[in-house]
Amino acid sequence: MYRYIKGIVTQINPQHIVVENNGVGYLVLSPVPYQYKIGEETTVVTYLHVREDIFQLYGFKDEETLNLFLKLISVSGIGPKSAMSIVAFDDTNKIIAAIETSDAKYLTKFPGIGMKSAQQIILDLKGKLVNDELDMQLLSDNSKDVAAALEALGYNKKEIAKSLKHVNFDQDLNKALKEALAILLK
């Protein structure tokens, strides 16, 4: 398996780039190929996907995007093509926040992801993408408001983070706060 390829970008297409290293041109499927420039030396973090009939090299700008991609393809029914469409269109923090807050509607905006797939992603990955510590940058507006209210009531960040993992933020803010409190009072 290749961990990364460092070389000169020699070709850019809508689906891939070609990175030349020591006279060998590697065709690398990229979620956002136009972030690279022809003639620029770059390091592409890679994943080699092996099927019985094909070897495909996927490339990403950073480890964080690669790690999210790998988590997504571990979900039943989500292949590399669907995972690429997810990481191509948005910031990884927004995607992680949507998964952690059970925002299936947000995930359905990506090509090839319907409600059933979005719910499967949430079911398989919720709680596995962030630490137990609360990361305010990853939270949606509703979850930030609930977190602030719980903090004002004297709960620590670890307790808040654990409760927010189980709250449905598609509902009204007051109901979400009540749900978080009910979880904390168990």
Swiss-Prot record:
Disulfide bonds: none annotated. Residues 134-137 are annotated as: Flexible linker. CDD domains: UBA_RuvA_C. One of its GO terms (molecular function) is four-way junction helicase activity. Residues 62-134 are annotated as: Domain II. Residues 138-186 are annotated as: Domain III. GO terms for biological process: DNA recombination; DNA repair. Pfam families: HHH_5, RuvA_C, RuvA_N. Belongs to the RuvA family. Homotetramer. Forms an RuvA(8)-RuvB(12)-Holliday junction (HJ) complex. HJ DNA is sandwiched between 2 RuvA tetramers; dsDNA enters through RuvA and exits via RuvB. An RuvB hexamer assembles on each DNA strand where it exits the tetramer. Each RuvB hexamer is contacted by two RuvA subunits (via domain III) on 2 adjacent RuvB subunits; this complex drives branch migration. In the full resolvosome a probable DNA-RuvA(4)-RuvB(12)-RuvC(2) complex forms which resolves the HJ. This is Holliday junction branch migration complex subunit RuvA.
